[in-house]
Swiss-Prot record:
Cellular compartment(s): Fimbrium
Pfam families hit by this protein: Fimbrial
Stored SUPFAM superfamilies: Bacterial adhesins
Keyword Cell membrane listed: no
PANTHER family according to UniProt: FIMBRIAL SUBUNIT ELFA-RELATED, FIMBRIAL-LIKE PROTEIN
Keyword Hydrolase included in the entry's annotation: no
Family note: Belongs to the fimbrial protein family.
Disulfide-bond pairs as recorded: C42-C81
Cellular component, GO, one term: pilus
UniProt name for this protein: Uncharacterized fimbrial-like protein YbgD
Predominant localisation class: other
Transmembrane regions listed in the UniProt entry: none
Source organism (scientific name): Escherichia coli (strain K12)
Length: 188
């Protein structure tokens, strides 16, 4: 029994001289979650809800001579589509989708461009949106309806964009080009 008391006493003494252990603050953070429940036959792919398109670089010589840069694909992917079961209230299965692009910053004219809103901006240039057949998209008006494949749960809506000289008589100057557009889908 005396031996057990010595062990207990030694343990008690060692606890007196042991430094408390604290968890070091090795970083912390906060996560914000955002989502939306929609009533539609398809979901927009998460990467295409808030999309960034790199239009690349174009020289002032090229854009002032050709009046635009090279075109870049602007695809909107739809996922988890259930087209045969969707009628959008019409009684007929959904087979098409209309897309309307718009912006609060656009040039004037018959087919406005998205205005360059960059702080270190190039002048005399905007961004043109085009449909899959290279037709100009009129901002604020529905683009031609696109056919949807009822047998597929995934769809890709093809569009294009490029930097375009606003007025062919006024040279574009060098600098950044930034423009923003919103889009709304209308299933039919």
């Amino acid at each position: 029994m005396f031996k057990g008391q010595k062990t207990l006493a030694a343990l008690a003494v060692s606890l007196l001289f042991t430094a408390p252990v604290y968890a070091a603050d090795e970083g912390s953070g906060e996560i914000h979650f955002k989502g939306e429940v929609i009533e539609a036959p398809c979901e927009i792919h998460p990467e295409d809800i808030d999309k960034n398109i790199d239009l690349g670089q174009v020289t002032t010589t090229h854009i002032n001579r050709e009046h635009h840069s090279n075109k870049v694909a602007v695809d909107i992917r739809l996922i988890n589509c259930d087209l045969p079961a969707s009628d959008n209230g019409s009684g007929m299965p959904v087979s098409k989708v209309g897309v309307t692009f718009d912006s609060t910053a656009k040039t004037t004219g018959a087919t406005p461009l998205l205005s360059n809103t960059s702080a270190g901006e190039a002048t005399g240039v905007g961004v043109r949106l085009m449909d899959k057949n290279d037709g100009n998209i009129v901002l604020g008006s529905a683009a031609p309806d696109l056919d949807l494949d009822a047998s597929s749960s995934e769809q890709t809506l093809n569009f294009f964009a490029w930097m375009e000289q606003i007025d062919n008589a006024v040279d574009v100057t060098a600098g950044e080009v930034t423009a923003n557009a919103t889009y709304v889908l209308d299933y039919k």
